[in-house]
Amino acid sequence: MKALRIVLAATALLSFVAAPLFAAEPGTWKLRAGVGTVAPESSNLTTDLGNDTLVIDVDDGTALTLSATYMITEHWAFDILAASPFSHDINARVIASVDPGFSPNSFKVAETKHLPPTFSFQYHFIPDGTIQPFVGLGLNWTTFFDTKIDPALAAGGITDLKLDDSFGIAAQLGADWMLNDNWLINVDVRWINIETDAALSGPAFAPATSVDIGTVAIDPWVYAINVGYSF
């Protein structure tokens, strides 16, 4: 009898230890808000400029981020990422063909803003743990707006920069740290395929109305830290 009580007590203890601490059941929502930084590739575009080479660089941008995750099953989820507009300076360098080793300081071409809504399916490895890591894969749509040419270029007759919308894949790696049944801290890293066709226009290109300068491969890493609520 004593041995039976010990076995039952041990079984109960093991059941308690193995019980889910913060189970993310199907139908659970996780809402997160925080700060994200978009870090584009350096040297996003290299194109010929007569006998020289033009190199375009896009600076980092930081903005508020929002995401909503819906648990379809204990492991599979659907995630939507939104954000306030990210702002970027677009700079250029001209590498002279007569001296390829010489590259002067970059000069500002324009500034622009973009919104990067992203839709992903996620797989959560430990949906009932205190730390809940996950991976995601999905699609991104990026739209550019409020693009402004630098006044120095505008004075020279280059008055507009057009950036087309972009559609591409997005990959994600992240984790939720469950503080209790509801509140959590989240960190995630995303790589997003963003490529946009760019064109300059203005009186400087007369009689042409615009000049295509190529495809700008932004392809940023996005780093974010968020506070979230699960219900």
Regions found by a protein language model. Name each.
Residues P40-L64, G157, L161-D165:
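Surface-exposed strand-loop-strand hairpins of Gram-negative outer-membrane beta-barrel proteins
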Residues S87-N91, D99-F102, N180-F231:
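Predominantly the C-terminal beta-signal and adjacent terminal strand-loop region
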Residues S43-G50, I90-V98, F145-G156, A198-A206:
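Outer-membrane beta-barrel translocator domains and adjoining extracellular loop/strand segments
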Residues A19-A23:
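Sec/Tat signal peptide C-region and signal peptidase I cleavage site
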Residues L8-V17:
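Bacterial N-terminal signal peptides
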